[in-house]
Amino acid sequence: MIGIDIVKIDRVTSAKSKFKSKFIYKFLLSSEVALVKNDASLAGIWAAKEAASKALGCGIGAELSFLDIEIYKDKKGAPKLKFNENIVKKFNIKNTSLSITHDGGFAIAAVIVEN
């Protein structure tokens, strides 16, 4: 399955300003906080998690939370994602691929989940 999401970076900036750290910890794991260099990278992580939820066909909600998905970087700095063990079993996930890009004030992510 494929999931794609686009987020306006200014929208993330506004939410961060309004809700402060509550906003960040609503969807970031502690391991992901270090990845946030600016609002564009924060928006990229948000888009990646939304795209991952769409690739599973369930969205963020009762079956899957933002905190069930971890975004990290490999040795070359490329973004990767993994789901927690319960989600891997529930959706029979075998492999994942992630791409994040930024352009024109937007963060865009595409995720492929193989079962």
Swiss-Prot record:
Gene3D superfamilies: 4'-phosphopantetheinyl transferase domain. It holds the Pfam family ACPS. Signal peptide: none annotated. Mg(2+) binds at residues 5, 50. Its EC number is 2.7.8.7. SUPFAM superfamilies: 4'-phosphopantetheinyl transferase. GO terms for cellular component: cytoplasm. GO terms for molecular function: holo-[acyl-carrier-protein] synthase activity; magnesium ion binding. Belongs to the P-Pant transferase superfamily. AcpS family. NCBIfam families: acpS, pantethn_trn. Transfers the 4'-phosphopantetheine moiety from coenzyme A to a Ser of acyl-carrier-protein. This is Holo-[acyl-carrier-protein] synthase. It comes from Campylobacter fetus subsp. fetus (strain 82-40). The lineage of its organism: Bacteria, Pseudomonadati, Campylobacterota, Epsilonproteobacteria, Campylobacterales.
